[in-house]
């Protein structure tokens, strides 16, 4: 697989992940995120994959929209670093949050699939 093909596959998986967040598609998120994935929120809260998905399953967190822009993908062998900006509307604990985030996302090739292993976001003013 060329780096251009890998980049295209990673972009497709990341788009699918953002869409799954909005749809609440747990099966897709389970498959895209590695079992040991770490999710660092803009608030500084760090969650495991299980903790993050549990909040979505319970309805404590629900994404209304997740729109990425300026997505860049850099591939380093079997790892890829994604950066970009996202406009997000989320319902958290009954409160609506409209956020603009700068993010870094890391994917690693595990077997024949690229899996998300880390996410970190920072709130933009």
Predicted regions and their residues:
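A beta-strand edge to alpha-helix "cap/lid" segment located at domain peripheries
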Residues: 1-125
């Amino acid at each position: 697989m060329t780096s251009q093909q890998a980049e295209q596959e990673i972009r497709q998986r990341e788009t699918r992940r953002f869409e799954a967040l909005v749809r609440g598609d747990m099966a897709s998120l389970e498959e895209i995120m590695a079992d040991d994935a770490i999710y660092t929120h803009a608030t500084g809260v760090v969650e495991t994959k299980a903790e993050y998905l549990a909040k979505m399953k319970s309805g404590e967190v629900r994404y209304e929209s997740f729109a990425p822009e300026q997505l860049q993908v850099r591939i380093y062998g079997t790892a890829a670093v994604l950066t970009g900006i996202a406009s997000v509307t989320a319902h958290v604990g009954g409160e609506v949050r409209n956020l603009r985030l700068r993010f870094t996302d890391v994917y690693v090739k595990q077997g024949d699939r690229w899996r998300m292993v880390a996410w970190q976001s920072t709130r933009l003013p």
